[in-house]
Structure formats: structure tokens, C-alpha cells
């Protein structure tokens, strides 16, 4: 569905997890905003007030003409890779499907509370909305603080795990209640594990030899 991005990164884009040599058309779309914040909205999904569809069409035609200039210099295919990226972007701003999918305020307040009123909880809820609308892949950054080289146990107990447990449990339950659990695979993991040995600062260091992965549904 070209009215929706195939790959969304929540809540913000990262320095990694992008398309690299595959080209810009495979990069994730990101709202670059916390869905738990007041007045959350995704920028540039609506046309400016002074730009109607006819004017947008003329701009698109002009851009297409300019893009044809010296295509022979595009040896790496960078410009060609942007073509589908632009086409999908135009489809998104001329169709209200993406606007509705990203409008988390359409959710009942009880549902929002069940996920947790924080960036992780609301990102998980927004991910469910996006998948339900037709987005095929959503990646969520669980926030900072997980690199617990110091004070590991207190950080996990008081801050990190309560938000994580609530958000992931609510997502899995919500998918099940909506009959989506057999079609949607939830995967939760970090890039490596933590050392079995506790260091002098009550922390656990990097341990690439073993890690845990949670799978649900799908």
C-alpha cells in the first residue's frame, strides 16, 4: 500500500537500522516525535494550506523534469533510488490513510493507559495501529538507559523493566484481542547480552556470547 510506509521506525530515526547500499527508497519512515507528548503529530503528512492538489501536481511535474537532467551522472543509482521514495511520499500526503494511522488520539484513553503513558508504551500502541492499517514492519527503540554498566539492578527494577513489561504485555494482549496475533510477529531483543559476573559498580558489562530474545505471535 503506497499510501503507507512499508517500514517505520519509532519514535525517532537512529544512526543505524537504515538501508545503506540498498538505497534511500528502503529507509524507514519516522515521525521524529514522542507519541506520548501533548499534541503529537507527524510533520508533513498534510499539504500546506496554500498548496492544493493541482499545484502539487505542477510541482511534481517540474521536479520530474529537473530530475531528468544529467541522469547519466548517477552512476551509483542514488537519484534513481529516491524516485520511489518521492512517489510514496506524494501518495502519503494526498491520501488520509497515513494521517489516520498515525493519529494515536483516536485510541480510547483506557487503551492508552494500558500500554503506559510513556514513549515506549505509546510507541508500542502506535506500532499496533500502523500494522493494523497495513504497515508491514515497525521497529521501536526502547529508549536509553539499558547499557547498565553501573547500578544494574536498581535501574532495571525502578525504571526500565516496569515500562517494558507493561508495554510489551499490553501489545501482545491487544494483538490477541483483535485477532491479529497469528499474523503479527513481535520480536524483542537487544544487540547483546550482559555479563553473568557483576562488576565493582553493581553493573553488568557487555556479553556478546549470549543474549535473550522474546518472540510472540506470528
Range-by-range predicted roles:
Residues 1-218:
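Ligand-binding pockets and gating/stacking loops
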Amino acid at each position: 500500500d503506497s499510501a503507507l510506509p512499508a517500514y517505520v521506525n519509532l519514535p525517532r530515526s537512529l544512526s543505524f537500522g537504515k538501508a545503506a547500499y540498498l538505497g534511500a527508497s528502503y529507509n524507514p519512515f519516522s515521525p521524529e516525535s514522542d507519541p506520548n507528548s501533548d499534541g503529537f503529530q507527524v510533520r508533513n503528512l498534510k499539504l500546506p494550506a496554500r498548496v492544493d492538489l493541482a499545484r502539487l501536481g505542477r510541482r511534481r511535474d517540474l521536479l520530474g523534469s529537473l530530475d531528468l537532467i544529467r541522469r547519466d551522472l548517477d552512476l551509483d543509482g542514488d537519484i534513481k533510488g529516491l524516485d520511489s521514495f518521492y512517489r510514496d511520499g506524494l501518495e502519503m500526503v494526498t491520501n488520509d490513510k497515513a494521517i489516520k494511522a498515525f493519529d494515536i488520539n483516536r485510541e480510547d484513553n483506557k487503551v492508552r493507559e494500558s500500554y503506559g503513558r510513556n514513549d515506549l508504551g505509546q510507541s508500542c500502541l502506535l506500532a499496533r495501529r500502523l500494522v493494523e492499517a497495513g504497515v508491514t514492519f515497525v521497529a521501536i527503540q526502547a529508549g536509553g538507559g539499558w547499557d547498565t554498566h553501573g547500578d544494574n539492578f536498581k535501574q532495571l527494577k525502578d525504571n526500565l523493566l516496569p515500562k517494558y513489561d507493561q508495554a510489551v504485555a499490553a501489545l501482545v494482549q491487544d494483538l490477541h484481542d483483535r485477532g491479529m496475533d497469528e499474523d503479527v510477529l513481535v520480536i524483542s531483543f537487544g544487540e547483546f547480552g550482559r555479563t553473568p559476573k557483576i562488576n565493582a559498580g553493581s553493573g553488568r558489562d557487555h556479553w556478546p556470547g549470549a543474549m535473550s530474545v522474546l518472540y510472540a505471535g506470528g
